[in-house]
Amino acid sequence: MSSSSWLLLSLVAVTTAQSLTEENAKTFLNNFNQEAEDLSYQSSLASWNYNTNITEENAQKMSEAAAKWSAFYEEQSKTAQSFSLQEIQTPIIKRQLQALQQSGSSALSADKNKQLNTILNTMSTIYSTGKVCNPKNPQECLLLEPGLDEIMATSTDYNSRLWAWEGWRAEVGKQLRPLYEEYVVLKNEMARANNYNDYGDYWRGDYEAEGADGYNYNRNQLIEDVERTFAEIKPLYEHLHAYVRRKLMDTYPSYISPTGCLPAHLLGDMWGRFWTNLYPLTVPFAQKPNIDVTDAMMNQGWDAERIFQEAEKFFVSVGLPHMTQGFWANSMLTEPADGRKVVCHPTAWDLGHGDFRIKMCTKVTMDNFLTAHHEMGHIQYDMAYARQPFLLRNGANEGFHEAVGEIMSLSAATPKHLKSIGLLPSDFQEDSETEINFLLKQALTIVGTLPFTYMLEKWRWMVFRGEIPKEQWMKKWWEMKREIVGVVEPLPHDETYCDPASLFHVSNDYSFIRYYTRTIYQFQFQEALCQAAKYNGSLHKCDISNSTEAGQKLLKMLSLGNSEPWTKALENVVGARNMDVKPLLNYFQPLFDWLKEQNRNSFVGWNTEWSPYADQSIKVRISLKSALGANAYEWTNNEMFLFRSSVAYAMRKYFSIIKNQTVPFLEEDVRVSDLKPRVSFYFFVTSPQNVSDVIPRSEVEDAIRMSRGRINDVFGLNDNSLEFLGIHPTLEPPYQPPVTIWLIIFGVVMALVVVGIIILIVTGIKGRKKKNETKREENPYDSMDIGKGESNAGFQNSDDAQTSF
């Protein structure tokens, strides 16, 4: 047999083997899809029941259903790993196997998987049920939603915002801290079991794309693209930041630095994520009609159902389908009135079997009106790819899913659209001033959140990589917050806190970079859809409602789900394969030009050294080695606890003796910041149970003076090795003369004048006496040699005796 015949037979054999492998894989996937949909639905339904009725019973049922789904998925994942991807030629089969070969948390042992689920459920419960009590009215204890969110959205009282902000992090964040530490360890272990470097690397894997002709994209490119686009956006953000800072100085004149960072609790919501609620304080042209239509919605009697009905009308107007009957029957669109504890954070649910729902404690506001469009955008995406195989029912990447609803929000927020649905009056006229008002409102929501998102995810990526030890989580968090976002903590936080986990997405295990990438994508999509709608004009004025051409172009992309590389799906809509920030910058260009003009005489950027509590802080410097030599001990967290407790003791003593008040200061009321390795730091003191009441520095100094010796003795140091800079180094208060300094000086001068007069008088008397003596006979003792210093005291004139002045 010729060599060519052998080659032909070999190729046939290989092709036959590949065909059998692919056929077996296809059969396996068909069986998986049928069984997976049922088990996934039961798990999702149990999760829905828990999120809409938080009870121990529902938590247990959710855990049981999740365990069944996890066990099934683990088994199927192992089977999928037996198929060689090199032998699979059909792309859609290969993509499903690739997805299933990633076993997720099933890669952990059964015990660790159970532990991880318990941690996640506990964190979710703490977040959803956490309460903060008003220090001025301890009986008034508020959930985040509704309650604290209202304070953070509307209050302009600095101290009210502060106790809500701090209380949420103290009550919830501190409880989450040990759980989040365990979560990081287990998630990293899970990621490595799935052949990723860490959990951040695992998350970024969602952006990987394989495909011919340049559609490839690796997860490291995501980091590069995020860094690149953020650098392009930063100048716009810096000018927005400078403008907002100047406006906030009008509302909080004593609490804002004209060159410093912005206090985190003044930025519109609990996290400073969206600055939307700052619009009333920063509106450029307040005399113009209000483009925030909240009042119009209230006056017209809108409710939650009306909000979602209007959102549905928008999607239908571009040719997308109505919501299902089950959606309206099963969704939770308002907070239940029956007292159930629920997770209010808005989420869209694709439970499977055509069951689509939204969970949201809707309020009648423009912000919630736009949020409804966003969440319904998720549902539209879910419905569009519902015919894809189970494993491909997802967005092209996570950012695509978030972007779809945001596209609709861009159009729904335009004055043109609001006018068309009666939320702006028919005689509303757009001009350059209303244009700037509109763009600023959009920027507060869209541009203001980008550094927040970027910085949060960068911090988590560094934590998962082990680049930030857990002993420095909060220190690094606030350093990065100051440097990247230009935001400063209103109170210093030590390592007992877990401020990142005070955000829903962190405590509930969501990747967050999706909210950054979605913002870039949404403007790319918007530009392309406006072109499809044959719109000519400024991008920020485009409203694609009623354009079925735009809707069909979008639907084509949505229907793909995750069956194609996201780079290809993006190209199908926008004609490009990568993130491009230019459409976003074009959208905001008129505002950017205006902001630069407004900021001509303002400092643009921020000084990271400034803090709201700097004026009341006292610096401490400790010299252990110079004081104790070989006996010097290490300054640890325990030593810091002892220091704070000692100051708390001093404050109790001072208030008891000087003010005749019993005030139960604790170590937690002594706020320490800026700890340096050479042992120096700052501290100030707040009232117990009321963080917004800062004790004046002068009173803290008096308390330290009163107890200085006791504090020194605790650490075996003295005034020179335990320095309170600015406080006199003595056990007693500095000497205060009983009369003023000028009076003392005047007295000294007058005394010298009197003494001078006396000397002149005495000298005159002596001179006269000497003249009289020359008339007497010669002194018999003139021949005596007195050069040797001898004198006869018996004959010394009493007036010549030496007397000290």
UniProtKB/Swiss-Prot annotation:
Glycosylation sites (chain numbering): 53, 536, 546, 660, 690
Polar residues compositional bias, start-end: 793-805
Amino acids binding chloride: 169, 477, 481
Positions in the Extracellular compartment: 18-740
Residues the record lists as binding Zn(2+): 374, 378, 402
Tissue: Expressed in heart, kidney and forebrain (at protein level). Expressed in the small intestine, with expression in the intestinal brush border (at protein level). Ubiquitously expressed, with highest levels in ileum, kidney and lung. In lung, expressed on vascular endothelial and airway epithelial cells. Also expressed at high levels in lung secretory club and goblet cells as well as in alveolar type 2 cells.
Renumbered residue ranges of the record's region Essential for cleavage by TMPRSS11D and TMPRSS2: 697-716
InterPro entries in alphabetical order: Collectrin_dom (IPR031588), Peptidase_M2 (IPR001548)
Cofactor(s), names only, from the UniProt record: Zn(2+); chloride
Motif Endocytic sorting signal boundaries: 781-784
Motif (PTB): 792-795
Active site: 375 (proton acceptor), 505 (proton donor)
Induction details: Down-regulated in lung after acute injury. Exposure to cigarette smoke increases ACE2 expression up to 80% more in lungs.
Gene3D superfamilies: 1.10.1370.30
Family: Belongs to the peptidase M2 family.
Protein name: Angiotensin-converting enzyme 2
Organism whose genome encodes this protein: Mus musculus (Mouse)
